[in-house]
Amino acid sequence: HATSTLYEPADFEGELQTMCLRENIVVITYFSLAAGFLTGKYRSAADFAKSARVPGIKKYLNPRGLKILDAVDAVARGCNATPAQVSLAWLMSRPGVTAPIASATNLNQLQEILRATQIGLDAEAMATLDQASA
């Protein structure tokens, strides 16, 4: 298992990714939406009242995290998608990633997550997201 998100791509990329590709090992990532941060619904400390996951989310709310969300928002607007869908589509496009794990607390969230499989990110969108998360 691996955590790999737009916020922390280095958790998987590099030696671990190379070995998984070489050995044909499937990779299923967890915390794929960075405890919900990459859904875009946590943009300030005031938003923490929306979730019991505050300890897991707080670490992402910083200038780097907000820069990543800005890039996700821009790409999402360009492909008529949500930030969660774009974040998952980016992750599913990574070499070696078989499937991301993302939780849903209601049917609407599940439908949103499933639509990520239909999002096609072009080279420009991928470059925007890669640059923001570097």
Predicted segment positions?
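Beta/alpha (TIM)-barrel catalytic core signal, keyed to glycine-rich beta->alpha loops juxtaposed to Asp/Glu
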Residues: 1-131
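The conserved 3'-phosphoadenosine-5'-phosphosulfate
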Residues: 134
